[in-house]
Amino acid sequence: MDRESAQTWLDAYTSAWKSYERAEIAALFADDVVYRYHPNDDPTRGVDAVVASWLGESDAPGSSTRDAPDTYDATYTPVAIDGDVVVATGSTTYRETPEGPVTQVFDNCFVMRFDEQDRCREFTEYYTKRR
């Protein structure tokens, strides 16, 4: 994995989050992906389970919920790459309404491992809410 490929993947990740398109989300991840929303959570395993979680279709502990359209944005950048491992940082912003002011900002760190097709096979998210 190189820096350009990592940035392309991160941009696709943000795009998939904004679209909530099943195929776009699935294309990011290896079939046997291990995905953690928090480092100490039990992982979500497998691309189908990750997609269901992103789409708010899963009731598994730690699963995601769908955000309202146009109420969030994010920018992530790779900061370290070692072979197939990428560490990225960035921030995520949320608004209560699409036209409203930013009400929450989170600083993020992703630790990811990729396969030969640049699909993520391990994903762990760390984040903290800005004060």
Tell me what each language-model feature is.
Residues M1-L28:
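Short acidic-aromatic low-complexity motifs
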Residues R3, A23-D84:
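A solvent-exposed, acidic/Ser-Thr-rich amphipathic alpha-helical stretch
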Residues A74, A88-G90, N108-F110:
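Hydrophobic residues positioned within well-ordered beta-strands of beta-sheet architectures
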Residues I81-Y94:
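A short hydrophobic beta-strand element
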Residues Y94-Q104:
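Short, cysteine-centered beta-strand-loop-beta hairpins and adjacent loop/turn segments enriched
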Residues V105-R131:
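Short beta-strand edge/turn micro-motifs at domain boundaries
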